Amino acid sequence: MDMNEHRNRRLKLIMISATFGGLLFGYDTGVINGALPFMARPDQLDLTPVTEGLVTSILLLGAAFGALLCGRLADRYGRRKMILNLSFLFFLASLGTALAPNVFIMAVFRFLLGLAVGGASAMVPAFLAEMAPHEKRGRMVTQNELMIVGGQFLAYVFNAILGVTMANTGHVWRYMLVICAVPAIMLFASMLKVPESPRWLISKGKNSEALRVLKQIREDKRAEAECREIQEAVEKDTALEKASLKDFSTPWLRRLLWIGIGVAIVNQITGVNSIMYYGTQILKESGFGTKAALIANIGNGLISVIAVIFGIWLVGKVRRRPILLIGLAGTTTALLLIAIFSIVLDGSMALPYVVLSLTVLFLAFMQGCVGPVTWLVIAEIFPQRLRGLGSGISVFFLWILNFVIGFAFPILLSSVGLSFTFFIFVALGVLAIGFVYKFMPETKGRTLEELEEHFRSRHDHNTPEQSVIEV
């Protein structure tokens, strides 16, 4: 085996190991979709629309704080160490949810599981962005998105198998939830073989160790040049005080933070997680039975996987901004059609199949365009010293909005119906398109250090009135 092949295999091992965090993220957020109908039974947890929303969304609230907390801790203790600790939390919380005797205990462990999900959502993309060469960064970071939707797909498949074969077993939802403990063990075992981020090592003065890591995944001369480039960027940062919220009072950093938060919000106001968490209920609302809805929901998971594979190829070829704009136009149109047909075909036998087809179309645009670019841009735009904090804050807002949507959706669905609920998401989708067109910068084709220098120097030389669209 020649050295280049060895380095590529090493880089692939790093990517696969870290993205088990994405798989856990996906399974834990997707499994509730099929578990809820069984969990809600009177002889189980006896859930109401409000407690359904609570059990679903408390994980998302935990994820918001997990992203914020883990971002700071990772800047202090390292990306790899945080991911290892998160694997233990995934394992513990998975067992807790599977064994929960009542709604209160379930909510506690779902919150703890959320801390792990949120931490992984912030840490894994940042870790991959720091390990990847710039020409592979887009594909490597979006592999995490593939693992997220792969985890959701596996959750839907296991839900359907268990839900159909054990439909008369009330506690079948416990088997659905405990499966998540397996990838948690795999994440821990695989991350033991992965090195720390060289950018984090240099930020802590461990330059020789960072160079050794870079030489494992880069050609020697390139590793040395990249090491010097990172050191120069870190030296500029160390002239400043320790990373804190005060840093974002600097105009160019404040602008990047608002862009990061904005892109995170854009991801959620598409309404994607109303479908990912409540797809089974949406299909039941449109006319499917419980078993048919569980099986049909596999289609949503499968198209998500196919779309992300396409998205990984796309981000390697096309700029970030047009991908995101096209994706948002597609998701907004699909939701508009669901809302319209829910009125026009109300009571028709065709409605459930039309809704299923349109949710598949929605997810094709969402997972192929919107999702990959969202996580990639959040991982790219912040400078090294503030990457953990900036990513953590951005992802915090993503999860807070996710929590609001996850909690409110079943209540909206039961009170105002499917069509009006989706009309709300259509209006928000139009606002999202406007934000991306006006404010989101282009980040493709530059190293993380080049992006940092570009954003910094652009603010120094440009007038405040100039739009970020020019970046």
Curated annotation (Swiss-Prot):
Has keyword Nucleotide-binding?
no
TM regions (residue ranges):
13-33, 50-70, 88-108, 111-131, 146-166, 175-195, 256-276, 295-315, 323-343, 358-378, 393-413, 416-436
User: What is the annotated localization of this protein?
Assistant: Cell membrane
Gene3D superfamilies membership: MFS general substrate transporter like domains
Quote the CDD domains the UniProt record gives. MFS_XylE_like
Which PANTHER family does the record associate with it?
Answer: D-XYLOSE-PROTON SYMPORTER-LIKE 2 (PTHR48023:SF4)
Name this polypeptide is given: Putative metabolite transport protein YncC
**Organism whose genome encodes this protein:** Bacillus subtilis (strain 168)
